[in-house]
Amino acid sequence: MLITAAQAILLQIPCEQRSPQPALYGRPWRTLDSLLLRVETDAGITGWGEAFSFHGGLTTRAALDSLVIPNLIGRDPSQIVPLMNDLQRRLHLYGRTGPVACALSAVDIALWDINGKMAGMPLFRMLGGSTRTHLPAYASLLRTGDPAHASRSVEAALKRGFRSIKLHEVDLDPVHAARDVAGYDIPLMLDVDCPWNPGDAIEMCRRMADLELYWLEEPVWPPENYDGIADVRSNGGIPIAAGVLAGSAMDFKHLVVAEAIDFAQPSVGKVGGVTELRKVIALASAYNVTVHPHSPYLGPALLATLHVNAAAGEDMLVEHLLVEPEATLYGAAVRPFNGSVAVPQGPGLGIDPDMAVLERYRAP
């Protein structure tokens, strides 16, 4: 079996606006973007992958088109590890994180999809098997800076059955408002996206002590200041989560060796796909670090996360971005219900994207 063609497809699906200034990573949020990779083989099997693409899909699509796809054609997709190692070595001059790493992550996911379909098995069974049909999910809310809207968003998440909630606020008033609505029986997480130096982060942790956060995510700039993150963990009094920005298992090794984190957050569309995500889980287990993957994805990267979580057999939470896009790639198949999401049971990733949605929302 050989790869005969590959195509990068950028989707931009408008989202319903329910807040005055919805934002993620500090930028306005108007569409839910998804960069898909379709890989075709001479056996008639098609695999689907997805790269992280929030606000940067055009750049990563260019990396796929100009650097990655030309190195895929004619290769054997059944040789996942050798093929991915070769691609990483060929393209390492472009950096081990960023658009090229995200593009390679999409390739790895597509290769696993192809191999699962070839074997007639869902990916979670190929990775070791599981009896779990549903996984716990948490609601991941957009940043608004508005306490009243934060309260309404938490109320909406609770009504939908979520029992864990993550905020993306940097001001404390919306976080206090969210805690007032959620109460203290609901785990509340806060992703601040690398705003502080270690000293300021420790001071903020002390100001947030009464919030009893389940974790504080990515508190330190730059995010590769592993010793600084470890300082915050040791002196801030709040469990620390990080790794969303990592491009490989080696990045996570630096985090765990520095004793910087309580929770590891590999992102399958950034870290190197399924292959590298599994390495991170094994590494974290060896250092007694809990893994909760970063997974605010629309397409195959979400499915890949579900399969890896299910195969791991642990209570790793699935991140669900609480937005309302005009359309979804899989209908209601992986829409959370009562705080959990179903694990696809079909071969490979289990479900192929809705082609009508692809055609309607495909970016030029």
Where are these regions (language model features)?
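Non-catalytic terminal accessory/regulatory regions of metabolic enzymes
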Residues: 1-46, 65, 69, 155, ...
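Conserved, mostly hydrophobic/aromatic
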Residues: 3, 44, 68, 107, ...
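Metal- or metallocofactor-binding catalytic centers and their adjacent structured scaffolds
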Residues: 40-118
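N-terminal small/glycine-rich loop or linker at the start of catalytic domains
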Residues: 94, 118-143, 177-179, 183-187, ...
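Active-site mouth loops of central-metabolism enzymes
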Residues: 134-149, 191-197, 241
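Catalytic core of soluble alpha/beta enzymes
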Residues: 167, 172-300, 336
